[in-house]
Amino acid sequence: MRHARGYRRLNRTHEHRKALFANMAGSLIEHEQIKTTLPKAKELRPIVEKLITLGKRGDLHARRQAAAQLKEDKDVAKLFDVLAERYKDRQGGYVRILKAGFRYGDMAPMAIIEFVDRDVDAKGAADKARLAEEEAAAEE
């Protein structure tokens, strides 16, 4: 019986799961949309939603808590500067999961996990330069 089993183990150790979700959360923050298996997407959603809530709090302690969960500083910066501003008026529900068929090799159910109101031009590292160019063009 699976009473009081609060999460999916995904056939991984605790440390492996922790690293997996840290990497996936960073990728989702960087690209704003990723494709993964459905169980991983369902487990990732509450992790990312809590990170967005930390970003909305915006204080130093929240930034340190987010940095402890994410691996890269650029992801923490985007979380607090871009995403927190985007979702400041939204009370939860920052992420959506769309079913995306089945993987060819093993028929694993796939899903696309993305931010609601996402930036469709988000392509990772070039984001900061692109946003700076758009702001400069808007000021002129």
Curated annotation (Swiss-Prot):
Ribonucleoprotein listed as a keyword: yes
Ribosomal protein recorded as keyword: yes
GO biological process: translation
PROSITE patterns linked to this entry: RIBOSOMAL_L17
Gene3D superfamilies on file: Ribosomal protein L17
Pfam families noted in UniProt: Ribosomal_L17
GO MF term set: structural constituent of ribosome
GO cellular component, one term: cytosolic large ribosomal subunit
Annotated keywords: Ribonucleoprotein, Ribosomal protein
Family according to the record: Belongs to the bacterial ribosomal protein bL17 family.
Subunit structure: Part of the 50S ribosomal subunit. Contacts protein L32.
NCBIfam families, per the entry: L17
Protein name as catalogued: Large ribosomal subunit protein bL17
Gene name linked to the record: rplQ
